[in-house]
Amino acid sequence: MSVSQVTDASFKQEVINNDLPVLVDFWAPWCGPCRMVSPVVDAIAEEYESSIKVVKINTDDNPTIAAEYGIRSIPTLMIFKSGERVDTVIGAVPKSTLESTLNKYIS
C-alpha cells in the first residue's frame, strides 16, 4: 500500500472514518527535515501495509486541518485510531522510534 495524499476535504473520510490505525505525516515541500523523514514514512507504509494506513498532508495547501490539530512545527507525525488522535511524534525521528510508537497501537 502506497502513501496517499489527503486534503482538508478528504481528511475525515481517509483518517477519521478509517477502520485501521492511521499514521498522518504533516509536511511541506520546503521543509528539509520533512524530506529526511519521507523515506522512513514510505518504508513504514510498505512494512505495515496490512496493519495501518499511512497518509501525508501538505500543511501549506491544507491549513485548516493543520490548525485544527495545532501543528506548530513539521514534520509532525500523528497516529489516529478509531477516529481519535492517540499519539504524536514531532521531528525527523529514526525509523525505530516511529516503529516503537506505532507498535503500541497495532493489535
UniProtKB/Swiss-Prot annotation:
Which cystines does this chain contain? 31-34
* One Pfam short name: Thioredoxin
Q: Which CDD domains match?
A: TRX_family
Q: State the UniProt keywords alphabetically.
A: Chloroplast, Disulfide bond, Electron transport, Plastid, Redox-active center, Transport
The Gene Ontology terms for molecular function here are: protein-disulfide reductase activity
A GO CC term?
Answer: chloroplast
* Cited InterPro entries: Thioredoxin, Thioredoxin-like_sf, Thioredoxin_CS, Thioredoxin_domain
Q: Where is this site: Contributes to redox potential value?
A: 32-33
Record flagged with keyword Chloroplast:
yes
Which residues does UniProt mark as catalytic? Answer: 31, 34
Q: Which domain of life is it from?
A: Eukaryota
Q: State the compartments where it is located.
A: Plastid, Chloroplast
The residues covered by the Thioredoxin domain are 2-107
Q: What is its main location?
A: plastid
In this chain, the site described as Deprotonates C-terminal active site Cys is at 25
Q: Which NCBIfam families does this entry report, sorted A to Z?
A: thioredoxin
Outline what the protein does: Participates in various redox reactions through the reversible oxidation of its active center dithiol to a disulfide and catalyzes dithiol-disulfide exchange reactions.
Provide the family line: Belongs to the thioredoxin family.
The protein depicted here goes by the name Thioredoxin
Q: What is the species of this protein?
A: Porphyra purpurea
